[in-house]
Amino acid sequence: ISQWGYDFRPAYLKIAEIRELLPGVPVLALTATATPEVVKDIQSRLNFREENVFRMSFERKNLAYIVRKTDNKTGELLHILKRIDGSAIIYVRNRRRTKEITELLMQEGITADFYHAGLDNAVKDLRQKRWQSGEVRVMVATNAFGMGIDKPDVRFVVHYNMPKNMESYYQEAGRAGRDGEPAECILYYAPIDNRTNRFLIENGEENEELDAITKQIVMERDWERLRQMTFYCYTKECLRHYILNYFGEQTL
């Protein structure tokens, strides 16, 4: 739900209508990432009349958050893969680059596969199983590689491109180190990432079903979230504290 902010997916709004028809049925809303503002939206739009919220800390003490500003992302990526052993996920923005980077890694002797929404389901399942089993070390993927991914020994997650918002970044980076052992979350940033994300926000197809006024509200919200994501790439403060503060958690 938090990925859609104020409007959510239109189908989610039907839940409130169903709740009116079935007032005695308990309802539990779950999300991995939600700012305090989005929590209030969920309560309001899904007709939770009593404030009854349980939150776990966003802090993952075993994760090291790193931002590298570079115009040589591929060189940096090869360096980190050769420096650190273990399973990895590399998130990239588009499907074409998943294949290109995979081929490059294979040429360097690093076992890798690519994954995106355009592949047949059977192919996606096979590649995920090969990666889960350790037969393949690195999965190069778009954000389609997300739901249900729970491999405990991922030693690092690399974002080859800056995501459009902190919610996406936190969820994807959080696939590292689920076994509690040290892991690294590395974001490679170049100024073109910000320009590309602005273009995607302004020309995105996911909001085409919305009316003009709502579409403008959603676009302005997405610009603000992109601004917060860009600040993360430039901040001099502790990145862990930045993440915790973004999600409304107090830090010392």
Across the structure, where does each feature detected by a protein language model lie?
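C-terminal accessory/connector segments of nucleic-acid motor ATPases
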Residues: 206-252
